[in-house]
């Protein structure tokens, strides 16, 4: 098992985690624990939102960069960890 697979398995085992996915720089999912339609929807929308958030952070301070994005709604909490080539996305129940 690769280090990436071990990390994803460890994250997925946390209480309340609904799903995890890794998305490439173009917004295409390359690893997921969710069904296909949910994965495609989340990957596309969160990729756009993350790119906009990165751009906003840089517009405010060109020396700065987005390191983590957390979105909490009534139903879910979505955490995005952007890297140069990938996004790690974790969806969990907010009450846990």
Curated annotation (Swiss-Prot):
UniProt entry tagged with the keyword Cytoplasm: yes
Pfam families: Robl_LC7
Predominant localisation class: cytoplasm
Protein localization: Cytoplasm, Cytoskeleton
GO biological process, one term: microtubule-based movement
Similarity remark: Belongs to the GAMAD family.
Subunit comment: Homodimer. The cytoplasmic dynein 1 complex consists of two catalytic heavy chains (HCs) and a number of non-catalytic subunits presented by intermediate chains (ICs), light intermediate chains (LICs) and light chains (LCs); the composition seems to vary in respect to the IC, LIC and LC composition. The heavy chain homodimer serves as a scaffold for the probable homodimeric assembly of the respective non-catalytic subunits. The ICs and LICs bind directly to the HC dimer and the LCs assemble on the IC dimer. Interacts with DYNC1I1 and DYNC1I2. Self-associates. Interacts with DYNLRB1.
Function (record text): Acts as one of several non-catalytic accessory components of the cytoplasmic dynein 1 complex that are thought to be involved in linking dynein to cargos and to adapter proteins that regulate dynein function. Cytoplasmic dynein 1 acts as a motor for the intracellular retrograde motility of vesicles and organelles along microtubules.
PANTHER family xrefs: DYNEIN LIGHT CHAIN ROADBLOCK
Name of this chain's protein: Dynein light chain roadblock-type 2
């Amino acid at each position: 098992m690769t280090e990436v697979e071990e990390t994803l398995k460890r994250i997925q085992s946390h209480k309340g985690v609904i799903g995890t996915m890794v998305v490439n720089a173009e917004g295409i999912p390359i690893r997921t624990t969710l069904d296909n339609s949910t994965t495609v929807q989340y990957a596309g929308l969160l990729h756009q939102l993350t790119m906009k958030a990165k751009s906003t952070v840089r517009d405010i301070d060109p020396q700065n960069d987005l390191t983590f994005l957390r979105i909490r709604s009534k139903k879910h909490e979505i955490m995005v960890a952007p890297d140069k080539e990938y996004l790690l996305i974790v969806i969990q129940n907010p009450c846990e």
